[in-house]
C-alpha cells in the first residue's frame, strides 16, 4: 500500500501506513456504532436499547470511545427509553 508521507525513516513510513489502516478501521467501527444508536433513536425498544448498549460497551472496552462518553450515551438512551 502506497501512503503519501514526508517521512524518510523506514519506521516512520511504516507507522504512517499503519495509521492509515487503523484510521479506516476506527472510522468503520464508529460508523457502525452511530448506525446502531440511530436505529434505537428511530425505534426506541428494549431490544434496540440492549443492542445499542452492547455496542457502546464494546467500543469503550476497545478504546474506540472514552468510558465517560459511553456512560453518558447509555444514560441518554436509557432516558429516551423510559419516556
From Swiss-Prot:
InterPro entries: Ribosomal_bS20, Ribosomal_bS20_sf. Residues 60-83 are annotated as: Disordered. Keywords: Ribonucleoprotein, Ribosomal protein, RNA-binding, rRNA-binding. GO terms for molecular function: small ribosomal subunit rRNA binding; structural constituent of ribosome. GO terms for biological process: translation. Pfam families: Ribosomal_S20p (PF01649). GO terms for cellular component: cytosol; small ribosomal subunit. PANTHER family: 30S RIBOSOMAL PROTEIN S20, SMALL RIBOSOMAL SUBUNIT PROTEIN BS20C. Binds directly to 16S ribosomal RNA. Belongs to the bacterial ribosomal protein bS20 family. NCBIfam families: S20. This is Small ribosomal subunit protein bS20.
